[in-house]
Amino acid sequence: PGEPLGAFIAAYIAIEIGALVSGKTKVDIIVTPVCCILSGAAAGYFAGPYISAAMKFIGQLVNINVDKSPIIGGIVVSVLMGIILTLPISSAAIGISMGLTGLAAGAATIGCCCNMIGFAVISYRENKFGGLIAQGLGTSMLQVPNIVRNPLIWLPAIISSAILGPVSSALLKMVSNPVGSGMGTSGLVGQFM
């Protein structure tokens, strides 16, 4: 318990159970919330530890692989976390769930930074200074509609992640912690964690 992916799955199960029960009785106002709360709590209680253990195991594998092979590991982690950051899911939650630390967390931070700064710079002509700040210090998630229309605009950020990820892990030995691994330049948290 206490892990973002486990909480998401528990909430999803609660929503589905609530949808199944809703509209079936005359006392829906009582039955539906009770079923949602109980099913979500049970799912979180019983599935949460296994989900948490699986995520920690995956995180340990990632941490070990980047430590053993900082060039290849740096490329993979940097590119994947940069992509995750830009998608409408929480890269910080994934970094925390996996427990990314050390060189792997540093490479993940660089991947997130490449996407945020990359999109901020390439969209400057249209978005001016406000867009530069919103995407550079906020989130590159603002570009999801543009990526859906033209996925090629993602290539410069992905390529820069692939180049700078191993630079951070193999040459500069940049390290971070689980929270900083998924933050990128958002509020400049990733660099200082």
Q: Which ranges hold each PLM region?
A:
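Pore-lining transmembrane helices
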Residues: P1-M193
